[in-house]
C-alpha cells in the first residue's frame, strides 16, 4: 500500500516533467541527426562521431568541412566511363597504359575500386550508375547503357566483361546489354561465379574477386 502511494505521487510528476534536450544541446542534436543520415550510421554511432569531432582541434573540423564541401561541389563524372573523377577524364581512362579495347561493365564506382584492388584487370571501365530494377523505377534509359552501346560500336572494342552483381536485377541487366551489343563485338564475357549469389562486388574479398575476373567465362555459356 505504501509503495502504491509513492508511485501514485511520482507518476503525475513524471507526466508533467519537462526535461532537457536529449543531447543537452540543440547543436549536438542537429549534428547527430545529419550524421545518422549516412548509410549504416545509427544515432549512437553518429553521436560518437560528433563527440570525436568536438574533441579534436578546430583544424580537423575545418578540414573535414572543406573536404565535404569540395567533394559535393567540385567532383565530376568521367565523360568516357562515368566513373567519379576530378577532371573530364578519370585517371584510368587517361592512362594510355591501360587496355582501352577491353571494357569492364560495373554498377557503380565502388565496384571499380574493388576490382582495382585486385590488380587483376588492366582494361578500362564503364559505370552504369545502377542496374535495371522496375520495382525502383530504373529502366535502361535511366542508366548509361546507351553510351556503352555507342562506345562498343564506335571504338572497335575487342572484349566486354559484364561484372554486375549476381542478383536478379544484375542478371537482367547483363542479358539486356548482351542483346544490345552482341552484334558489335564477338567477345562478351562475365566474371566467374566466385562471388556468391546476391553478393555485391565491393563486399567480395580481393582474392575471390580477382579469380572471378581472371577465370571469366563467355556470357553465352552462362545462359
Regions found by a protein language model. Give the residues of each.
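Long, charge-rich boundary regions
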Residues: 102-161
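Long C-terminal interaction/binding lobes of large macromolecular proteins
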Residues: 149-223
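Conserved nucleotide-binding/hydrolysis micro-motifs of P-loop NTPases
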Residues: 86, 97-98, 109-112, 131-134, ...
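Solvent-exposed alpha-helical segments within well-ordered globular domains of core cellular machineries
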Residues: 29-33, 47-51, 62, 66, ...
Amino acid at each position: 500500500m505504501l509503495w502504491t502511494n509513492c508511485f501514485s505521487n511520482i507518476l503525475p510528476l513524471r507526466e508533467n516533467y519537462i526535461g532537457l534536450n536529449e543531447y543537452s544541446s540543440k547543436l549536438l542534436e542537429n549534428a547527430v541527426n545529419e550524421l545518422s543520415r549516412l548509410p549504416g550510421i545509427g544515432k549512437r554511432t553518429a553521436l560518437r562521431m560528433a563527440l570525436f569531432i568536438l574533441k579534436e582541434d578546430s583544424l580537423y573540423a575545418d578540414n573535414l568541412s572543406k573536404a565535404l564541401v569540395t567533394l559535393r561541389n567540385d567532383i565530376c563524372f568521367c565523360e568516357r566511363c562515368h566513373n567519379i573523377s576530378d577532371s573530364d577524364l578519370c585517371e584510368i581512362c587517361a592512362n594510355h597504359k591501360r587496355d582501352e579495347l577491353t571494357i569492364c561493365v560495373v554498377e557503380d564506382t565502388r565496384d571499380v575500386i574493388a576490382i582495382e584492388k585486385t590488380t587483376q584487370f588492366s582494361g578500362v571501365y564503364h559505370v552504369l550508375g545502377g542496374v535495371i530494377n522496375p520495382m525502383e523505377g530504373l529502366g535502361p534509359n535511366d542508366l548509361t547503357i546507351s553510351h556503352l552501346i555507342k562506345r562498343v560500336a564506335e571504338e572497335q572494342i575487342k572484349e566486354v566483361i559484364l561484372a554486375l552483381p549476381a542478383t536478379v536485377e544484375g542478371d537482367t541487366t547483363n542479358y539486356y546489354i548482351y542483346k544490345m551489343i552482341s552484334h558489335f563485338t564477338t567477345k562478351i564475357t562475365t566474371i566467374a561465379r566466385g562471388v556468391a549469389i546476391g553478393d555485391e562486388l565491393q563486399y567480395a574479398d580481393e582474392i575471390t574477386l580477382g579469380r572471378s575476373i581472371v577465370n571469366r567465362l563467355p556470357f553465352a555459356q552462362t545462359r
